[in-house]
Amino acid sequence: KQSGYELYSDYFFDTVTIITKDKTDQIFNNALAQKVNIRKVNSEMLSVSFDEKKNVYRANQLLKIFNCAESIKENPTENLPNLPKNLLRTSTYLDHQVFNSYHSETEMLRYLKRLEEKDIALNRSMIALGSCTMKLNAVAEMIPITWREFSEPHPFAPIEQMEGFRTLFTDLKNWLRSITGFSGVSLQPNAGAQGEYAGLMVIRKYHLERGESNRNVCLIPSSAHGTNPASAQMVGMKVVVVNCDKQGNVDFEDLKKKVEAHSENLGALMVTYPSTHGVFEEKISDICELVHKHGGQVYMDGANLNALVGIAKPGNFGPDVCHINLHKTFCIPHGGGGPGMGPIACKRHLEIYLPSHPVIKDCGPATGIGPVSAAPWGSSSILSISWMYIKMMGSEGLKLATQIAILNANYVAHKLKNHFPILYKGTNGNVAHECIIDIRSIKNDTGVTEEDIAKRLIDFGFHAPTMSWPVPGTMTVSYTHLTLPTNC
């Protein structure tokens, strides 16, 4: 301000935006010449972000870049009021006893150890959570995320400075194309639900560009993940539920009725394959063909892609777009709620609508739907985990992992079927990647609930399966490739 610049806002946290007018390009080039990255917001504004590692030397370097005569002396004592008074916190914080009970490193260490001993993780037990695909988080996969080359680059760093990341992005996209059979891939979505949102936005734009804005009906089977109808609502689509039959498949006759009833306005069908009921939809290609016949597009929820890798490619049996949970099928650890990555893959006719970004222009097509995530390539620092997994496994290893996952699910179902009913099976009597154990009759006869069984498993050191989902009163079990049948 003392040098004549105006701030875009006097209120800021870690990023300051400066109105630079006709000096913008000169200052931006000054910064590049000194190997300092600042953001060019537009032709008249620049922004600078700070973290805890920035010091007085760096601050003075920035002042020189902005051609300021002033400098900051060591240990400045002045603070600018950078937050409005009505947003300042007045209540107390960190009041819980735990924040005021441990005052030495040893006490803290022992407290953390006590918490760890109460936990059940992969270092103690297999994790059989149905629909979660808890795969091996190998040390070799995880090490690269600790390297500063992956952890420090800013998402908006100039692309010419990110050749290593660009190679990683290219490899992953090519591998995902090969695995899924689709033509286009976007790495931007940050989670499976965000992948759903992105895929449906792509479908919506496809219809809009064809002058069919009326196509806003989204058919969703009753077995779907709860995120499916939520994503459809978020993109402005009307949800119509399709029933499932007694075997857990999409009721094809009910689908016919719904498709014909909404033919003029049919936008999309969201279908999970294999289904959340743990069965392969034998009519999946017929389902896709029917929707296409009535002008709709097919979105495949890729939550269960772990049952397909190396065996079947979604791009070859009907769907137009799907998301890929890298945190499930491709081994990014996601216990405790994150982090996730949900790239989408699509057929050629939808490629031009994939997510783009206003800051990093070439992360997607100029004709795309715009950003669905703050960063152009999502949580790019964890993509190295999936890169390592795919690279080390190779095509044969990936196929074997799928086969073992399906074998394990069927092994468990076979061993339990005489004691606990398996709710859904395919026509050959087998399940896909997971099985649903029906506890309801036991509950009615004895009062023992699925929650009681889960807690008892925990008592014996086993991680509990998924309870009461997708069917209340059941337990869904999914053993991936990391568990031997002897452990099942």
Where are these regions (language model features)?
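Conserved phosphate/anionic-ligand binding catalytic regions in large, soluble enzymes, centered on
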Residues: 121-140, 190-196, 334-339, 345, ...
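Conserved small/polar residues in nucleotide/adenosyl-binding loops
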Residues: 480-486
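Conserved PLP-enzyme active-site core in the AAT-like
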Residues: 17-18, 164-166, 194-360, 364-368, ...
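Short, hydrophobic beta-strand segments
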Residues: 49, 91-96, 271, 388-391, ...
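Flexible inter-domain linker/hinge segments
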Residues: 56-128, 132-140, 145-151, 488
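Conserved N-terminal alpha-helix of the aminotransferase class I/II PLP-enzyme fold
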Residues: 104, 149-190, 195
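Conserved PLP-binding catalytic core of the aspartate aminotransferase-like
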Residues: 3-32, 50-54, 421-459, 474-475, ...
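Active-site C-terminal subdomain of aminotransferase-like
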Residues: 1-2, 8, 315, 321-443
